[in-house]
């Protein structure tokens, strides 16, 4: 059985405060984008019960496969019941550590795919609870629609936002941004910004209304990322921002983006919302 985990961008990211548990409270609008990995899960009677054989292709994923979020997600379902042996393959298209949520999306889709394949009958609330334990933004990828995210990112509320026909240009410079470092170097705002209200304003106003408060600390250490944002605005983007903690920067265009040249080590995707 196949699934196609999708990526996301953040429209605005307000880091509100650091919590006693070490996490940060945030406020952000998470938007699905049509950039996908490919995940396949099949049963194999020759494998032992609860055995997972996991393989990967495509873009490189750091770390041991057994520590991958996909394996951790399926293992979380094994806590409730014994599962048959599974062969799992992930073809990676969404870059890791890029602010696009690829790893969290893979984990969320692994939960749903395993539930459907094996007819486990897990409720949406149960899957979201597991997802929230796997990663702060993991539960978002179970919903597949625009959401206002609060708390660590796991408190979600649907938002009405029509981006159909709009074009988004993603540029990833291949720079690894440490999320921990980005959080360590920023100053939390201390208050919510009501981003859910602000995003209802015309897109021409978003530049002033939807800040990513992680940008100053990231741009200070990685001016090449800041330069991408400037270039997108210079070429007609209605709105441009770093997604999450970076390093991907996106521009939203009313019309098809113009042809641009980028360094060879930059990954670029031009996508359109259906």
What are these regions (language model features)?
Residues 142-239, 252-266, 270-274:
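Conserved, helical-rich catalytic subdomain that frames metal- and/or nucleotide-binding sites
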Residues 13, 37-41, 137-141, 147-148, ...:
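Short beta-strand scaffold segments in enzyme catalytic cores
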Residues 1-96, 116, 120-125, 160-162, ...:
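ATP-binding N-lobe of GHMP and related small-molecule kinases
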Residues 31-32, 132-133, 139-142, 159-164, ...:
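Solvent-exposed alpha-helices and their adjacent loops that cap or buttress functional pockets
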Residues 11, 39-41, 70, 103, ...:
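Residue-level signal for inorganic ion chemistry
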């Amino acid at each position: 059985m196949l699934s196609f985990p999708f990526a996301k961008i953040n429209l605005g990211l307000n880091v509100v405060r650091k919590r006693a548990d070490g996490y940060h409270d945030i406020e952000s609008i998470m938007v699905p984008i049509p950039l996908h990995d490919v995940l396949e899960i099949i049963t194999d009677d020759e494998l032992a019960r609860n055995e997972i054989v996991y393989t990967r292709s495509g873009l490189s994923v750091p770390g041991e496969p057994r520590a991958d979020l996909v394996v951790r997600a399926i293992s979380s379902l094994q806590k409730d019941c014994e599962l048959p042996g599974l062969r799992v393959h992930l073809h990676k298209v969404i870059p890791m550590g890029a602010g696009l949520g690829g790893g969290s999306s893979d984990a969320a889709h692994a939960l749903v795919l395993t539930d459907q394949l094996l007819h486990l009958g897990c409720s949406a609330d149960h899957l979201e609870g597991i997802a929230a334990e796997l990663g702060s933004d993991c539960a978002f990828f179970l919903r597949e629609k625009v959401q206002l995210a609060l708390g660590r990112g796991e408190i979600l509320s649907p938002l009405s936002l029509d981006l159909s026909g709009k074009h988004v240009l993603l540029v990833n410079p291949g720079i690894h941004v440490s999320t921990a470092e980005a959080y360590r170097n920023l100053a939390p705002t201390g208050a919510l910004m009501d981003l859910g209200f602000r995003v209802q304003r015309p897109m021409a106003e978003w530049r002033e209304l939807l800040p990513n408060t992680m940008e100053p600390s990231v741009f200070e250490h990685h001016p090449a990322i800041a330069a991408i944002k400037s270039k997108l605005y210079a070429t007609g983007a209605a709105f441009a921002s770093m997604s999450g903690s970076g390093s991907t920067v996106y521009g939203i265009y009313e019309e098809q983006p113009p042809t641009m040249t980028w360094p060879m080590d930059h990954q670029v995707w031009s996508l359109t919302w259906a």
